[in-house]
């Protein structure tokens, strides 16, 4: 199960290694959103 905690950047799925995660594409966004 994918975990979604808003605001974006906290926890998206199991990906927590990047600063900001695009919750729509589940891809790391450089520089944040």
From Swiss-Prot:
Subunit and partners: In plastids the minimal PEP RNA polymerase catalytic core is composed of four subunits: alpha, beta, beta', and beta''. When a (nuclear-encoded) sigma factor is associated with the core the holoenzyme is formed, which can initiate transcription.
Primary location group: plastid
Catalytically driven reaction(s): RNA(n) + a ribonucleoside 5'-triphosphate = RNA(n+1) + diphosphate
Broad EC category: transferase
Function: DNA-dependent RNA polymerase catalyzes the transcription of DNA into RNA using the four ribonucleoside triphosphates as substrates.
Lineage: Eukaryota, Sar, Stramenopiles, Ochrophyta, Raphidophyceae
One of the record's GO molecular function terms: DNA-directed RNA polymerase activity
Enzyme Commission code: 2.7.7.6
GO cellular component, as recorded: chloroplast; DNA-directed RNA polymerase complex; mitochondrion
Localization annotation: Plastid, Chloroplast
Protein name: DNA-directed RNA polymerase subunit beta'
Keywords: Chloroplast, DNA-directed RNA polymerase, Nucleotidyltransferase, Plastid, Transcription, Transferase
Family indicated by similarity: Belongs to the RNA polymerase beta' chain family. RpoC1 subfamily.
């Amino acid at each position: 199960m994918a975990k979604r905690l808003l605001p974006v950047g906290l926890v998206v799925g199991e990906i927590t290694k990047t600063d900001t995660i695009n919750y729509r594409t589940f891809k790391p966004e450089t520089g944040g959103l």
